[in-house]
């Protein structure tokens, strides 16, 4: 236990009154979030096929019977969640999605539910795949079209998340997913956190971690802007700015100490390199996006001088990304009874034990 007087608290966390008021607001919001998401009734949806196996279970495609709109049902086994001690993260993903849903750059959460063995999230189906898959298929992407459009979508997504005092903390190629119109959305809010001042929790994928996180100096929403810089570098060069398959210790040393260098090819517009350079400023107090003007500073950058942000927000701009359209003929007869490795033994142990974090499923 660490003792701290009022002066020490102020130096570390800021004025106590601001912290207290923000904390009260957070608690009020958490109470409200649980009523914002409708309870899921699978009878209102038609099963189509299995999309894949996630970390805790299956993701399956469903169509809403009332209008035919497609959704992805994320079914997560409670036993696996408890085994990996991820109850808190699954719960907060649901709460944050419920709070943030409705924005054009965050997936719609259409409902949630639970039964004895699983928790369920019915999410907007994003048919275009993620940026990682796009780079795997095509290699480095075009700066003036795809990369700039991706950057703009991500800026608006982070702007929405940050307005709720939430740091995303897991921005990476795999968590930027393309919808049917070619727009990019933020997915996977398991590591997101409402940050009132600073957090000292190390999290996220190593090659996207900001210097202040790897050095343990405490971080805030500024880590998301650093991660955006890494993402854009990777989309342009199909390589990481600091990681060339080195171990994590060396990677973190480079992130904290090595200067940013751009490859000689392809040649980029000066405004593009300047934008990325400002995002990858090792000093978080001088990093673009983390300054007093927040996301507005990114939107006003010269690289976006002709970007119509209003049309982008309304999704009336034509995306340079053309996703493969969903075909109903691809639906398979496979049921949701796909085996998850070691599921039976884990499930038996779970049913016979006491959940150490009982109550986390109340959010569903």
Task: State where each predicted segment sits.
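Protein kinase glycine-rich loop
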Residues: 48-59
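Glycine-rich ATP phosphate-binding loop
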Residues: 58-80
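Short beta-strand micro-motifs within the conserved protein kinase catalytic domain, predominantly
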Residues: 108-117
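Conserved short submotifs of the Hanks-type protein kinase catalytic core
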Residues: 116-130
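Activation segment signature within eukaryotic-like protein kinase domains
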Residues: 150-151
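Eukaryotic Ser/Thr kinase distal regulatory-tail detector
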Residues: 272, 313-364
